[in-house]
């Protein structure tokens, strides 16, 4: 594991699947081992590569927190991968990119072996701690992720190398008492803007949450964004 310490690069890439894709929600773990969930919409067909959203839960969370996306993924033909962190939080907050990067890479390999994915439509998304991880890991993998979606992030600590410029969507509640809106408004969003990223920043009246209307805006932005 030490060889991957502070290594943010993901190596898995979309390819021609050689295994049959499941349909619906499939667990990637067990009752004793944290894993994640793969959701494949019924309309998926291997001859039509699908968009992919990789969704990262908040601190102490689980993959099932993203079940709210099943319906829009079904509607729009999006494949959803919701991996789970190896510990309570994603490992960027611990000052390294290690076990979580390795697991995420293996989870992506699992998806790419089963699902035909559009390489120009892969988003890394997250809420809270997961949003911070998306904004930290994403800049080093701009050759894989076309978009980054961050709901109520707290920080962005990217590591070299910085590759590509994925488009960025950030939302934050003006009444957030867990991670104040100023973190995004005055820090994270301006930083990405100054670094040359195309960014959409949304504030909403509310707390530390993902209101349905904001999630809809993010998905519409993802699907409508030009490659």
Regions found by a protein language model. Give the residues of each.
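A domain-start/cap signature at the N-terminus of enzymes
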Residues: 1-51, 96-99, 125-132, 137, ...
